[in-house]
A protein has these predicted regions:
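Short, polar/charged alpha-helical segment
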Residues: 28, 32-55, 224
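A bilobed periplasmic-binding-protein/Venus flytrap-type ligand-binding module shared by bacterial periplasmic
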Residues: 130-137, 172, 244-255, 274
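A ligand-binding cleft/hinge motif common to bilobed small-molecule-binding domains
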Residues: 88-92, 212-230
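Short beta-strand->loop
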Residues: 99-106, 119-123, 145, 213, ...
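Periplasmic-binding protein-like
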Residues: 127-128, 186-189, 195-196, 227-251, ...
Length: 326
């Protein structure tokens, strides 16, 4: 009987170890990347890390964070890692002690302002928001101010900051900009601009001719143009807002080990070149530029104060919902 009990206990231990090993090989990722890009990212990560399986939940940043907040409230957060649009969302999570610091992460070659000084999140790329317009549009916009002119009446579409993290970051950044301010958004509303669910819907509307002008992230417009879509893109004269699509490990991660591997991959030369090949501007300059950005062309960025944006973004979302509807 003693031998049987010992054998049974050993069997249970072996099963427990096997279950632990299987669990350690599954990584849960929540991301706001477009579906095709999320698939490419995960497949490249898995190729570099054999044996690791990845479960993905993909949605707009705002929807994703709403889901995550509900999981926190229930005491059952699911993701191990996040790859979402903007640093402001990460700052809010960090403030609530939801992020796990990774001090050993290799940040060589990254701009100092692209990652958290305490190394809880790390920018993976630079995504700017500018103006897209259909090739057949009557006007050729050059500035944000153009979009509130009578010639653009009822012709502009933009992503809702209630869904898109990049749009939310731009909204509060513009509100803080003395040259534009919140008046820019009231001007858009008065000029008949409509807000749609996300950047993908903006691209569809502009490329399809439903609306001639759109507020849109750079890579979507320029990649579509490269594929033959009748769309043009301009970096407005006043400058553009930019998000860094940061990656982070949750403090509640069930699989932090593979979470660190995921961060390592995103920041690696291979991960950065993958971002470039998908049409993004990588966080590491050494990874090169996407085809749509020639050498020597510099992008003017709007001044950004992440902490100031973080402090006002929820109030700005409420103001936007009141102005444009939820």
């Amino acid at each position: 009987m003693k031998n049987f009990v010992t054998t049974l206990a050993a069997g249970h231990l072996a099963l427990a170890l096997l279950a632990g090993a299987a669990h350690a090989g599954t990584l849960t990722l929540y991301t706001s990347q477009p579906e095709a890009d999320a698939t490419k990212t995960v497949e490249a990560f898995k190729a570099a890390n054999p044996g690791v399986e990845v479960e993905i939940f993909r949605s707009g940043t705002s929807d994703l964070l709403t889901k995550l907040a509900a999981e926190f409230a229930a005491g059952a957060p699911q993701p191990d890692v996040l790859l979402i649009a903007d640093a402001v969302s990460m700052e809010l999570l960090k403030k609530d002690n939801r992020l796990l610091a990774y001090p050993e992460a290799d940040v060589e070659g990254l701009a100092p302002d692209s990652y958290d000084a305490e190394r809880t999140y790390f920018g993976s790329k630079l995504i700017t928001t500018g103006i897209a317009y259909n090739s057949a549009a009557a006007e050729k916009p050059e500035s944000w101010a153009d979009l509130v002119k009578p010639a653009y009446k009822d012709g502009v579409v933009m992503p809702s900051p209630l869904y898109s993290g990049a749009a939310a970051y731009m909204m509060s950044g513009v509100a803080l900009d003395p040259a534009l301010g919140w008046e820019f958004y009231t001007g858009l509303k008065d000029n008949g601009t409509i807000a749609v669910r996300g950047n993908g819907a903006v691209l569809k509307a502009v490329a399809g001719g439903e609306k001639p002008y759109g507020v849109l992230v750079d890579f979507m417009a320029l990649n579509a143009k490269a594929q033959g879509s009748p769309i043009e893109f301009v970096f407005p004269a006043e400058g553009v807002s930019a998000v860094t699509e940061p990656v982070a490990i949750l403090s509640s991660a069930k699989n932090p080990e593979d979470g660190r591997r995921f961060v390592d991959f995103i920041l690696s030369d291979a991960g950065q070149k993958l971002a470039r090949d998908m049409g993004y501007l990588p966080a590491k300059a050494s990874a090169g530029r996407p085809d749509w950005l020639p050498e020597g062309v510099e992008i003017k960025l709007m001044p950004a104060d992440i902490k100031a944006v973080t402090e006002r973004i929820e109030a700005d979302k409420a103001g936007f919902a009141e102005l444009f509807g939820g």
